[in-house]
């Protein structure tokens, strides 16, 4: 995958994540700057999605740890580089843990 496609994919993904949070009832702050999406929950915890262009990976930092995701062309999903778990499942779990609400991330 070339760098331009990688950035397009991450831009689209970050917009989907922002939209899912905007549609939720959670009290949180979203900041997207320099390719890094930061979600600040009411309790002060954060969920951070950052692009790692040289590796063509998306990194997620959550209260439960750090996770690296690769884009799977066959499924059109970002998958954990070890367990192959889809990004949406991790975001759902982290949001429930940190924000106390079950937020769906369709298509992720």
Curated annotation (Swiss-Prot):
Query: Which Pfam families did the record assign?
Result: Frataxin_Cyay
NCBIfam families xref list? FeS_CyaY (TIGR03421)
Gene Ontology BP term (one):
iron-sulfur cluster assembly
Q: What name appears for this protein in its UniProt entry? A: Iron-sulfur cluster assembly protein CyaY
Give the matching SUPFAM superfamilies.
Frataxin/Nqo15-like
Instruction: Name any GO cellular component annotation.
Output: cytosol
Concerning its family, UniProt says: Belongs to the frataxin family.
Q: Which GO terms describe its molecular function?
A: ferric iron binding; ferrous iron binding
Q: What is the lineage of its organism?
A: Bacteria, Pseudomonadati, Pseudomonadota, Gammaproteobacteria, Pseudomonadales
Stated role:
Involved in iron-sulfur (Fe-S) cluster assembly. May act as a regulator of Fe-S biogenesis.
* InterPro entries to which the protein is assigned, alphabetical: CyaY, Frataxin/CyaY, Frataxin/CyaY_sf, Frataxin_CS
Give the species this sequence originates from: Pseudomonas aeruginosa (strain ATCC 15692 / DSM 22644 / CIP 104116 / JCM 14847 / LMG 12228 / 1C / PRS 101 / PAO1)
Which keywords does this chain's UniProt record carry? Iron, Metal-binding
CDD domains according to UniProt? Frataxin
């Amino acid at each position: 995958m070339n760098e331009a496609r990688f950035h397009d994919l991450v831009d689209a993904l970050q917009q989907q994540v922002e939209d899912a949070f905007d549609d939720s009832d959670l009290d949180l702050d979203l900041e997207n700057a320099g390719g890094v999406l930061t979600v600040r929950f009411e309790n002060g915890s954060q969920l951070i999605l950052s692009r790692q262009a040289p590796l063509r990976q998306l990194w997620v930092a959550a209260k439960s740890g750090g996770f690296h995701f690769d884009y799977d062309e066959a499924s059109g999903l970002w998958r954990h580089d070890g367990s192959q778990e889809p990004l949406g499942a991790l975001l759902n779990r982290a949001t429930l843990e940190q924000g106390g609400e079950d937020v769906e991330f369709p298509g992720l």
